[in-house]
């Protein structure tokens, strides 16, 4: 068994698609109309056959509450791995991404956290 799709709640699918592709550099894999919303998945440019990230609308009240609560508590919604965190931090800062935590060594890993502008904090990690 393997993970093929994982999701992240977003406030606005179009805004999320723009942020995740133009700022972070992910590639749109699927964009299928499904009534009021769309099934939008993204993949890493380095692993286009790998795990897909679904931009899930947060329309359900439980999803909205969950997203608001973890954001207000400063908890990242998900984590992305990077080879060189300082290089990635600098690249994202140049693109206007707002970080809530600068690169910080924590034991064997270094982490940084940014705001995805769609209601989430995202952690990047270098192992």
From Swiss-Prot:
Disulfide bonds: none annotated. Residues 1-127 form the VOC domain. InterPro entries: Glyas_Bleomycin-R_OHBP_Dase, Glyas_Fos-R_dOase_dom, VOC. One of its GO terms (biological process) is L-methylmalonyl-CoA metabolic process. Keywords: Lyase. GO terms for molecular function: lyase activity; methylmalonyl-CoA epimerase activity. It holds the Pfam family Glyoxalase. PROSITE patterns: VOC (PS51819). Belongs to the glyoxalase I family. PANTHER family: GLYOXALASE/BLEOMYCIN RESISTANCE PROTEIN/DIOXYGENASE (PTHR36437), GLYOXALASE_BLEOMYCIN RESISTANCE PROTEIN_DIOXYGENASE (PTHR36437:SF2). This is Uncharacterized protein YurT. It comes from Bacillus subtilis (strain 168). The gene is yurT.
